[in-house]
């Protein structure tokens, strides 16, 4: 294993802006933040972490994906970019993750995206910064409970721009362009290296060598078309190291006495590093429109529309196919068809072999193409009523939202003309690749998702003599369906919340939630979840007034329960499930000697139980406690610390592996509220910002730490206590403990063995249970694989309208297991990685 890997990357951005330079803080003590159901609360009305990001901070970063713009901005969010693409490979995923991005929010990877109070998978909307007014990060328990069960693991609450009343029209145009560089592509051996390593492997195994000296000499010519000794550099033929990037955005907003508006249009184009196939690129167009109008004195009506249209064009190969075939497997091409094999005259003939039956270079050129087209439409309409004529401070808000997502993949799945080849015989018979062509495109796959949301909220605000009360009740309904699930997924819940603040020093909040889900039996469909919060602004106390270097000191805490349910989880798990099938049985007269029951075939029908009923199935529950401290001092520094403990109980899992075989139910599922785990962690941040005339400087550092421990698991029964997973972290890495290498034959004969074919130089493993043999009972925890600390450094320098930002993020205190998968690249005659080449011995 690599010992305590620490990774760090830096992003340098230079921005020319037409707006003033703003401070780099993400927590503003003098501002308000948006909360669920169109609520706005000041810093002195909340008991949570108050993590909010404004449009200025987002627009200052020139990165094409919104998730990348969040990198390093606050300790609660950890963003890892795994690849440099922008298209969404997880359009169904309820969280922010994809194959290119891994996003954690206080240890959870299941946070959701909420746009204008409507949940939508992030991959289906992909908003740009000029469409966003603010992002509020919901991390503390009471803040999450305000929205409901879907936010149980945290959420990004995005509020889009609406324009402003009595505001002149403002037009903002921004453009980005650049080049993406693939800095790390796995390296694999060239043809000569492969031949030598293959010879060595065969010699060790007692086989004759395939590649004689004249073959090695031939491979050294590096000729991909050599009919005797080909050596193909697939990486240079199929990949490039750069790709173009460009983005343009236009936003204009404003308003008059009765109407306000906001319109945004954005386009993004990204190339690809795959070059030997049909067009490989990604294009995205999105637009948003918001129109709000006052109708009379007490009514405000608004309509918001967001749409996304994206195209992902690609061939039938992926970037990693360059390593799938050894460089010496066959020549790239073998000539041209004479027309006697069913192909057109002069059709290129590509080489394949009996061992490696796919020529990925040819597949990229002639294997066809496909275009993934995504279309998203979000339409929200709302009516706000000012009921102060009835009760002063009373308001009503009604919203209806409809979301439609359609993904269609259209293309051609064609084939190239391939012949088998060997170095001894040259061109052989035609392969299974016969050069099939299609006359037109066809639909290769499709996916649809629909969501209907509705909520009604009554709110009441009152303030007098230093007392402030904000209260509300919200009724929410969500209805979701998608192509992969024929059943509707429905949630219905009611939340009641109240906040009380006295002289901006003492704040109390309560949230009560009564939630229901269609996933459960009617007797267990609804559950009650309460939350509470307290905050004390110590700096406003009289005894603190003489300490002038302290600008703000606030202690806050929240504690409560929230329901856990997967909105797209399998429904009706509380019911039994059966499947019917037919089978043939041989009975009757016996006309063959090898037939036991006869040779007349009779069709019989039978029913199999796939799932056992559990009518007691119900909500999983999440208990969470949060404690935080905010400390601003010297009118330049801002410090925050947040500690949290979260325990998940009664998660729904399949416990069929715990049923004794004597029950006769093997192969049948049984779901139960069973597993339990807890998470504990902390976030810290320290920021500095100062403006000196036309100069501006900012600096910040933040860090977070967390770990998740399993408290109850299924099938956790072992002979030895040290093998139990209960009580260990979820990222624990289990394996045999290596204590050295065999150096003598005496060691081989005397020490516990794990195979009968031990050789000098093989690894020695510890016999943990002292039973004289090495087996699975000797597996112990060797390390953990998730970082124990994520951190970020932010630096900013500005002069008038010129600004430089430096953002660095990293992770520390974890280990990467060097498993057999690293060393077994090239098993048999397969290709070898450079890692294997460099670590032989």
Label each region the model flagged.
Residues 70, 117, 135, 158, ...:
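Conserved RecA-like P-loop NTPase ATPase core
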Residues 1-27, 70, 532, 701:
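Bacterial Sec-dependent N-terminal signal peptides
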Residues 290-299, 305-309, 353-413, 423-731:
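Extracellular/periplasmic, surface-exposed regions of secreted and cell-surface proteins
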Residues 115-116, 502, 799:
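Structural motif
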Residues 601-610, 647-676, 707-785, 803-841:
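Surface-exposed, extracytoplasmic segments of Gram-negative outer-membrane nutrient-acquisition systems
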Residues 4, 22-112, 118-120, 124-130, ...:
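Membrane-proximal, glycine/serine-rich, low-complexity loop/turn segments characteristic
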Residues 114, 471-479, 507-516, 764-786, ...:
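Catalytic-site beta-strand/loop segments enriched in glycine and acidic/polar residues
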Residues 57, 269, 516-518, 690, ...:
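A generic structural motif
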């Amino acid at each position: 294993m690599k010992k305590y890997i620490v990774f760090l990357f830096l992003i340098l951005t230079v921005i020319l802006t037409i707006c003033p330079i703003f401070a780099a803080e993400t927590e503003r003590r003098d501002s308000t933040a948006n909360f669920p159901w169109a609520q706005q609360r000041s810093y002195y009305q909340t008991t949570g972490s108050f993590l909010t990001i404004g449009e200025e901070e987002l627009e200052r970063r020139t990165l094409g994906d919104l998730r990348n713009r969040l990198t390093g901005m606050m300790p609660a969010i950890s963003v890892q970019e795994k690849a440099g693409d922008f298209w969404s490979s997880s359009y169904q995923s309820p969280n922010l993750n994809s194959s290119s991005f891994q996003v954690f929010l206080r240890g959870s990877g299941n946070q959701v995206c909420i746009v204008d109070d409507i949940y939508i998978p992030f991959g289906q909307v992909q908003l740009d910064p000029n469409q966003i007014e603010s992002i509020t990060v919901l991390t503390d328990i009471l803040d999450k409970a305000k929205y409901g069960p879907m936010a149980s693991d945290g959420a990004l609450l995005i509020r889009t721009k609406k324009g402003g009343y009595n505001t002149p029209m403002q037009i903002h145009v921004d453009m980005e362009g650049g080049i993406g560089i693939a800095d790390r592509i796995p390296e694999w051996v060239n043809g000569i290296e492969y031949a030598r390593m293959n010879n060595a492997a065969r010699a060790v195994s007692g086989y004759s060598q395939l590649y004689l000296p004249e073959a090695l000499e031939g491979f050294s010519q590096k000729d991909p078309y050599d009919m005797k000794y080909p050596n193909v550099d697939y990486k240079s033929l199929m990949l490039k190291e750069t790709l173009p990037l460009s983005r343009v955005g236009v936003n204009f907003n404003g308003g008059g006495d009765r109407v306000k508006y906001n319109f945004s249009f954005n386009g993004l184009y990204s190339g690809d590093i795959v070059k030997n196939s049909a067009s490989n690129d990604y294009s995205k167009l999105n637009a948003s429109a918001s129109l709000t109008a006052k109708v009379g004195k007490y009514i405000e009506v608004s309509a918001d529309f967001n749409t996304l249209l994206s195209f992902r064009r690609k061939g039938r190969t992926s970037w990693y196919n360059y390593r799938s075939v050894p460089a010496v497997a066959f020549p790239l091409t073998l000539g041209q068809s004479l027309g006697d094999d069913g192909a057109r005259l002069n059709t290129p003939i590509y080489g394949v072999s009996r061992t490696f039956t796919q020529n990925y270079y040819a597949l990229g050129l002639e294997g066809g193409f496909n275009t993934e087209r995504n279309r998203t439409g979000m339409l929200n309409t709302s009516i706000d009523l000012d009921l102060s004529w009835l009760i002063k401070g009373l308001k009503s808000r009604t919203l209806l939202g409809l979301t439609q997502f359609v993904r269609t993949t259209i293309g051609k799945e064609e084939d190239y003309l391939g012949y088998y080849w060997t170095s001894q015989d040259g061109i052989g018979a035609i392969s299974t690749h016969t050069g099939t062509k299609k006359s037109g495109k066809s639909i290769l796959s499709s996916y649809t998702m629909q969501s209907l949301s509705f909520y009604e909220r009554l709110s009441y605000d009152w303030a007098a003599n230093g007392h402030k009360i904000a209260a509300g009740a919200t009724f929410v309904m969500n209805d979701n369906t998608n192509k992969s699930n024929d059943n509707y997924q429905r949630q219905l819940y009611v939340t009641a919340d109240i906040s009380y603040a006295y002289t901006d020093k003492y704040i109390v909040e309560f949230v009560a939630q009564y939630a229901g889900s269609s996933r459960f039996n009617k007797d267990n469909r609804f559950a009650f979840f309460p939350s509470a919060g307290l905050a004390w602004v110590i700096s406003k106390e009289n005894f603190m007034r003489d300490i002038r270097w302290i600008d703000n000191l606030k202690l806050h805490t929240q504690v409560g329960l929230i329901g856990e349910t997967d909105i797209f989880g399998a429904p009706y798990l509380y019911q039994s499930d059966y499947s019917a099938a037919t089978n043939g049985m041989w009975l009757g007269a016996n006309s063959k000697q090898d037939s036991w029951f006869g040779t007349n075939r009779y069709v019989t029908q039978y029913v199999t139980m796939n799932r056992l009923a559990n009518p007691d199935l119900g909500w999983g529950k999440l208990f969470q406690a949060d404690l935080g401290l905010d400390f601003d001092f010297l009118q330049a520094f801002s410090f925050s610390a947040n500690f949290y403990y979260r325990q998940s109980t009664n998660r729904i899992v399949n416990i069929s592996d715990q049923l004794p075989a004597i029950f006769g139910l093997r192969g049948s599922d049984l779901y139960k509220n069973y597993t339990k785990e807890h998470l504990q962690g902390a976030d810290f941040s320290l920021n500095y910002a100062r403006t000196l005339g036309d100069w501006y400087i900012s600096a910040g550092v933040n860090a977070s730490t967390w770990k998740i421990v399993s408290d109850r698991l299924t099938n956790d029964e072992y002979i030895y206590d040290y093998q139990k997973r209960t009580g260990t972290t979820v990222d624990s890495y289990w394996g045999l403990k290596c204590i050295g290498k065999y150096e003598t034959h005496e060691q081989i004969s005397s020490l516990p063995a794990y195979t009968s074919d031990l050789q000098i130089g093989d690894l020695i493993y510890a016999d943990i249970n002292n039973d004289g043999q090495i087996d699975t009972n000797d597996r112990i925890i060797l390390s953990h694989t998730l970082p124990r600390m994520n951190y970020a450094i932010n630096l900013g320098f500005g002069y008038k309208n010129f600004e430089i930002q430096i953002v660095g993020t990293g992770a520390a205190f974890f280990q990467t297991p060097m498993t057999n998968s690293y060393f077994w690249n090239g098993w048999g005659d397969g290709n070898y990685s450079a890692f294997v080449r460099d670590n032989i011995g």
